[in-house]
Curated annotation (Swiss-Prot):
GO molecular function: ATP binding; glutaminyl-tRNA synthase (glutamine-hydrolyzing) activity
Complex formation: Heterotrimer of A, B and C subunits.
Family annotation (HAMAP family): GatA
Keywords, comma-separated and alphabetical: ATP-binding, Ligase, Nucleotide-binding, Protein biosynthesis
Similarity remark: Belongs to the amidase family. GatA subfamily.
Job description of the protein: Allows the formation of correctly charged Gln-tRNA(Gln) through the transamidation of misacylated Glu-tRNA(Gln) in organisms which lack glutaminyl-tRNA synthetase. The reaction takes place in the presence of glutamine and ATP through an activated gamma-phospho-Glu-tRNA(Gln).
Native organism: Aromatoleum aromaticum (strain DSM 19018 / LMG 30748 / EbN1) (Azoarcus sp. (strain EbN1))
Annotated protein name in UniProt: Glutamyl-tRNA(Gln) amidotransferase subunit A
Gene Ontology cellular component terms for the protein in this record: glutamyl-tRNA(Gln) amidotransferase complex
Pfam families according to UniProt: Amidase
EC number(s) stated in the UniProt entry for this protein: 6.3.5.7
Catalytic reaction(s) noted: L-glutamyl-tRNA(Gln) + L-glutamine + ATP + H2O = L-glutaminyl-tRNA(Gln) + L-glutamate + ADP + phosphate + H(+)
Alphabetical GO biological process terms: translation
């Protein structure tokens, strides 16, 4: 059961081969046994999980089960969960118990999924390694001296180690796709606005988007189907018909299932900066796509190299505004001693926020300040439009764009902690996708030096999630990279 797909788990639950309570207990016991070495979870909600599992068993007995009824999952600790700690990986919210559920959490509860707890993350989703968490870094299950990626590193590590079959995450500049690549799982960030941000603690509002982790594209498709949908409480939520992202996956197997699919290869993604072992795995995966009938064409994203500087103006600017609400008055950390209100604000924020969060708040405040707004923020927004236009021009000549998800495999804990620029460069292939608001997916495609996973990124046009998932699914039907498990998951 530990390594079963969602389809296999659904069949076992429906056939009464295992109950929801037994399944939840199986994974909860694994968390208790293994998470001390991974630190993938901030909060484990055993009592709440078993209560939800009993309710799921009642639904199954009544013939009212949906695809996710009784399926265990975990939520990134950026999603508000009623009655359960919601920390966002920060001292500022270390004791915050949310009074309501995020829209995503509510949808998955309604679907009957069983939440086992909340996963570790970089503080306020600011980071690429999960080292910025107030609760200590999550560890990569393939090598616990290495990072799992970030900011959704806990969710990725939990799925890779089979502490849960699926997990939610968020992606602002690569925070689902990059950890998916570094831990050898599949992760998808949908088109901006497809998943509601209501109850998802904000970092950069024009970039944040909920996403899904699973062992396979098929598992991600089922989770994303349940997460997506219009929410009037989120002004950026898109009102679109409900979509089943699994709809193309059941087609009969064919010798060349991807015949006619044109894959664009941006020259900017295959230049200097990509590690040799990553390049070898990515090129072998592209050969695999060609063997399935796809053709590859060269495309260009001429402004892609400007994505990181544009992002690190726009995202901190939005963060400086979003995080101004954490002042120690209504909720969150409050300094123990202060002389007046102003000192309470300053001391509470100084004590509650970590170094990277403070760095980004300072940068954001600076670029929005009088005299610098035009020079920095407006210029970054212009670059953002150019990057989006580049993607549209490239996608006019292909169906999906492919390349590496991360320029390297997972690095050792502490290796880049003192060099923010090197840390930021780890998202060089993912950030542009967020700036354009496009859907992106990462799936395992091989291993690099030290038997560390490598991910291939697929990017599509707006609302092409089903196409990306289908392409990844066909690749996974013909390969077994997504079935490889770290020794800790045995």
């Amino acid at each position: 059961m530990i390594n079963a797909s969602l389809t296999e788990l659904r069949a076992a639950l429906d056939a009464r081969k295992i109950s929801s309570v037994e399944l939840a207990t199986l994974f909860l016991d694994r968390i208790e046994r293994l998470d001390a070495s991974l630190n993938a979870f901030i909060t484990v909600d055993r009592d709440g999980a078993l209560e939800a599992a009993r309710a799921a068993d009642a639904r199954i007995a009544a013939g009212d089960a949906g695809p996710l009824t009784g399926i265990p999952l975990a939520h990134k600790d950026v999603f508000c969960t009623e009655g359960v700690l919601t920390t966002c990986g920060s001292k500022m919210l270390a004791n915050f118990v949310s009074p309501y559920d995020a829209h995503v959490v509510s949808l998955l509860k309604t679907a009957g999924a069983v939440s086992l707890g909340k996963t570790n993350m970089d503080e306020f989703a600011m980071g690429s390694s999960n080292e910025n968490s107030h609760f200590g870094p999550a560890k990569n299950p393939w090598d616990t001296t290495r990072i799992p990626g970030g900011s959704s590193g806990g969710s990725a590590a939990a799925v890779a180690a089979r502490l849960v079959p699926i997990a939610t995450g968020t992606d602002t500049g690569g925070s689902v796709r990059q950890p998916a690549a570094l831990t050898g799982v599949t992760g998808i960030k949908p088109t901006y606005g497809v998943v509601s941000r209501y109850g998802m603690i904000a970092y950069a509002s024009s970039l944040d988007q909920g996403g899904a982790f699973g062992a396979s594209a098929a598992d991600c498709a089922q989770l994303l189907t349940a997460m997506a949908g219009f929410d009037p409480r989120d002004s950026t939520s898109l009102e679109r018909p409900a979509e089943d992202y699994s709809r193309e996956l059941a087609a009969p197997a064919a010798a060349r299932p991807l015949a006619g699919l044109r894959i664009g290869l941006p020259k900017e993604f295959f230049g200097a900066g990509m590690a040799d072992d990553v390049r070898a795995a990515v090129e072998a995966a592209l050969d695999g796509y060609r063997a399935l009938g796809a053709t590859t064409v060269d495309v260009s994203l001429p402004n892609a190299q400007l994505a990181i500087p544009a992002y690190y103006v726009i995202a901190p600017a939005e963060a400086s505004s979003n995080l101004s609400r954490f002042d120690g008055v209504r909720y969150g950390h409050r300094a123990a001693e202060y002389r007046d209100l102003a000192e309470m604000y300053s001391k509470s924020r100084a004590e509650g926020f970590g170094a990277e969060v403070k760095r980004r708040i300072l940068v954001g405040t600076y670029v929005l300040s009088h005299g610098y707004y035009d020079a920095y923020y407006l210029q970054a927004q212009k670059l953002r439009r150019l990057i989006a236009q580049d993607f549209q021009a490239a996608l006019a000549g292909c169906d999906v764009i492919a390349g590496p998800t991360s320029p390297t495999t997972a690095w050792t804990i502490g290796e880049k902690s003192d060099d923010p620029v090197q840390m930021y460069l780890s998202d060089i292939y993912t950030i542009a996708v967020n700036l354009a608001g496009l859907p992106g997916l990462s799936h395992p495609c091989g291993f690099g030096a030290g038997e560390l996973p490598v991910g291939l990124q697929l990017v599509g046009d707006y609302f092409s999630e089903a196409r990306l998932l289908n392409a990844a699914h066909r690749f996974q039907q013909a390969s077994d990279w997504h079935l490889r498990r770290p020794a800790i998951a045995a």
